[in-house]
Amino acid sequence: MAQLKVTQTRSTIGGKQNQRETLATLGLGRIGKSTVQEDTPGVRGMIRVVAHLVSVEEVDES
């Protein structure tokens, strides 16, 4: 299964509570922090909620 590298690029100050919780669920919390997530519909949905706060790249599995 493909993997996605999710990097937080913007702050959550002034953001909604559900956006902060979604970032925490993705393992983010500071600008510049990155995590690698499996490419599943659930993760894609979480990324959609915080799309304006993160950048996403596909990661090679090899």
UniProtKB/Swiss-Prot annotation:
GO molecular function: structural constituent of ribosome
Pfam families named in the record: Ribosomal_L30
Protein's UniProt name: Large ribosomal subunit protein uL30
GO cellular component: cytosolic large ribosomal subunit
The organism of origin for this protein: Beutenbergia cavernae (strain ATCC BAA-8 / DSM 12333 / CCUG 43141 / JCM 11478 / NBRC 16432 / NCIMB 13614 / HKI 0122)
Matching Gene3D superfamilies: Ribosomal protein L30, ferredoxin-like fold domain
SUPFAM superfamilies in alphabetical order: Ribosomal protein L30p/L7e
Assembly description: Part of the 50S ribosomal subunit.
Coiled-coil boundaries: none
